[in-house]
Amino acid sequence: MNKNKIFLAKKTLQYLEKKKLRDINLKNFLSNTKVPNMNNKIDLISNINDFFDFQLKKSLVNIEKSSQRDMLFEIMMARYDILNEYRTSVKNIINYFMSRPQGVLKLIPKLIESKILIATFANINPSGIQGVIKIKIIFVVYYITLFTWFNDENESLEKTMSVLDKYLNNIEK
């Protein structure tokens, strides 16, 4: 991820700590940035998602190899920890899309890419029919758990860990 996109993601997240996504005036907001192809709020959120993926990759450099299930747990929790650093901003984004679900549809390809990244780091092959099914399962588990994260005010994310652990255990059965 290039430094201009990182700068824009951080700028957007910083803005969203205090203001709502719906209040962003794109022309003014993007006036001092050097990132091409930022045409709408979906592009801004897509860039933030890329930034979170970039942060996740950096955090997983020394991940301990273990079972796929344990690695999925560690990787997903690492992602929730990253989201937690920007909690207010992420909650603003989620709230924005709760009232505009059609916008999420435009983000699905980018969100799937993120789940493929998670699967790959967990040594899960995303190819073929089995891979597609596994990605769909990871997608569902991740977003169901995200709703727990949304309400988990504990800094250690105990509720989030518990719910994620429960769902991953159910998948194994």
Predicted regions and their residues:
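Amphipathic alpha-helical packing segments from all-alpha helical-bundle domains
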Residues: P101-I124, V132-Y143
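Hydrophobic alpha-helical connector segments
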Residues: V61-N92, S99
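Short conserved catalytic/interaction loops centered on acidic-Pro-aromatic/His motifs
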Residues: E153-M161
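Hydrophobic alpha-helical segments that form the core
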Residues: Q130-F150, V163-N170
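Short, basic, alpha-helical segments at the C-terminal edge of helix-turn-helix-like DNA-binding modules
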Residues: N49-L60, P101
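Short amphipathic alpha-helical segments and their helix-coil junctions
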Residues: K57-L60, I112-I129, D165-N169
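Short, amphipathic alpha-helix enriched in basic
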Residues: M1-L30, V35, I45-S46, D50
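Solvent-exposed, amphipathic alpha-helical segments
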Residues: K11-K18, Q55-S59, I93, V141-D152
